[in-house]
Amino acid sequence: MNILSCSINTFKELLYDISGVEVGQHFYWQIGGFQVHGQVLITSWVVIAILLGSSILAVRNPQTIPTDVQNFFEYVLEFIRDVSKTQIGEEYGPWVPFIGTLFLFIFVSNWSGALFPWKIIQLPQGELAAPTNDINTTVALALLTSVAYFYAGLTKKGLAYFNKYIQPTPILLPINILEDFTKPLSLSFRLFGNILADELVVVVLLSLVPLVVPIPVMFLGLFTSGIQALIFATLAAAYIGESMEGHH
């Protein structure tokens, strides 16, 4: 119990320190004595509006013979379903909405930063950036994933889920506990680092050379942005499947 308590306290302190990581000048709101990252909320609302608008457009008038738009969204849904089924197994059904939401939010957020350099928008104070450019967003998504796989394991196995911490031998208890903390950290830092680096490269090139020159870098950013969204969603599904099956 002392090991678990120390690990939790250390993890909480680490998350608090991470939340203060800044690159560039952030745009803040003061709400009820709290300092809120306004640029994350603004760009997140833009991303959510794009996703909601696209969803409404896709289901507004479904056809027996699908249109091009309907075909596209059906393909996206099938792709997400296949990823979930491959990683989670036969009980993937209830998790498709969660995995799909993660994938689509991260994908559109990443692409918004790759296609449109938010930092060039002039604000009285601070600057805008893609939602996934902020460590608080990626940590929040990673923690949601952690909650999801704990919930999946406890729902499937009950308290027997915690037997995994002493398998194959109780000596590995500290390492197995540490693994639950390293998973969200690796998820969040991988996504944050890649998206931040991509946006910084594009902004620097735009400030130094004509618009045409950074275009190849922007295309590379689009590719890596899509890959990062897929990696995050795939790992999230794999962690959920692992917690339900009980194997590593």
From Swiss-Prot:
Keyword Acyltransferase: no
UniProtKB keywords: ATP synthesis, CF(0), Chloroplast, Hydrogen ion transport, Ion transport, Membrane, Plastid, Thylakoid, Transmembrane, Transmembrane helix, Transport
Gene3D superfamilies documented for this protein: ATP synthase, F0 complex, subunit A
PROSITE patterns referenced in this protein's UniProt entry, alphabetically: ATPASE_A
Cross-referenced InterPro entries: ATP_syn_F0_a_bact/chloroplast (IPR045082), ATP_synth_F0_asu (IPR000568), ATP_synth_F0_asu_AS (IPR023011), F0_ATP_A_sf (IPR035908)
Membrane topology classification: Multi-pass membrane protein
SUPFAM superfamilies in the cross-refs: F1F0 ATP synthase subunit A
Family, similarity comment: Belongs to the ATPase A chain family.
Entry protein name: ATP synthase subunit a, chloroplastic
Gene (UniProt): atpI
